[in-house]
Amino acid sequence: MSQAEFDKAAEEVKHLKTKPADEEMLFIYSHYKQATVGDINTERPGMLDFKGKAKWDAWNELKGTSKEDAMKAYIDKVEELKKKYGI
């Protein structure tokens, strides 16, 4: 697992033939943020921002996960999605 593999996966996920399910997208989003930013560093969105709260909660669940572990999980998930949805 390398930065180049991670960058390639981040590009490939944009070209899937079908949009992944919301839960799959939350996994991709949260692991990307953990790998690139680290632990969450923002306040939880307001009560009516349902999408923002879901994304924040997914990222917050990864607090303490290393950059390397987040990158590996992200790459593995993108590979799974490529097989499921095509590219």
UniProtKB/Swiss-Prot annotation:
Residues with N6-(2-hydroxyisobutyryl)lysine modification: 55
Subcellular location: Endoplasmic reticulum; Golgi apparatus
Modified residues (N6-malonyllysine): 55
N6-succinyllysine carried by residues: 8, 17, 55, 77
A GO molecular-function descriptor: fatty-acyl-CoA binding
Residues modified as N-acetylserine: 2
Keywords (A to Z) from UniProt: Acetylation, Endoplasmic reticulum, Golgi apparatus, Hydroxylation, Lipid-binding, Phosphoprotein, Transport
GO biological process: fatty acid metabolic process
Record domain ACB: where: 2-87
Function of the protein: Binds medium- and long-chain acyl-CoA esters with very high affinity and may function as an intracellular carrier of acyl-CoA esters. It is also able to displace diazepam from the benzodiazepine (BZD) recognition site located on the GABA type A receptor. It is therefore possible that this protein also acts as a neuropeptide to modulate the action of the GABA receptor.
Protein name in UniProt: Acyl-CoA-binding protein
Gene of this entry: DBI
